[in-house]
Amino acid sequence: ERFPGVPRRLQVVYRGDFTILDDFGHNEASLRAVFQTITGMDYRRLVIVNYLKGTRGIEANEITARHIVRAARKARLARVISTRSDSHVSRKNIVQDEEEEAFTAIIAGAGIPIVNTRELPAAISLGLESVGPGDLLLLLGPSGMDAGADLALRLLHQPPREKQLLPPALLASG
């Protein structure tokens, strides 16, 4: 039986004139894997839409920003769009001003163009407007980005992602 992959773990959600890749980016190992994978892909430029990690402290957002900066040149990074996803997260995941500021300071300090948004739909729209033929759009971040791929697909007039279930053999082994 073919394993469909794990949703939001280096998931290709759209392939057309450009590609959309979605990843939860939940820890440093995950971020390393994302950027290592991306640098091996064939694309023209990279645009990242990143959900800031709300109520996880400044350090969590600084870690993500540092991984982005380290990968920027090799990954041909064109711009970063960050979002608080205010209307798409629970109270416990609300991004604090200092979390956004910490992330932004590192990205901007490296000379990478960055735009901050409060809402996920605005960030996704801006991400789609920022890509061209051959580009890669990376949707990155935990729960506040969960709806990101489906929003992008809707804006591209594409059907939503199929809900992926784990194969029965994996469920039985747990």
Give names to the regions the model predicted.
Residues R2-G174:
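ATP-dependent carboxylate-amine ligase
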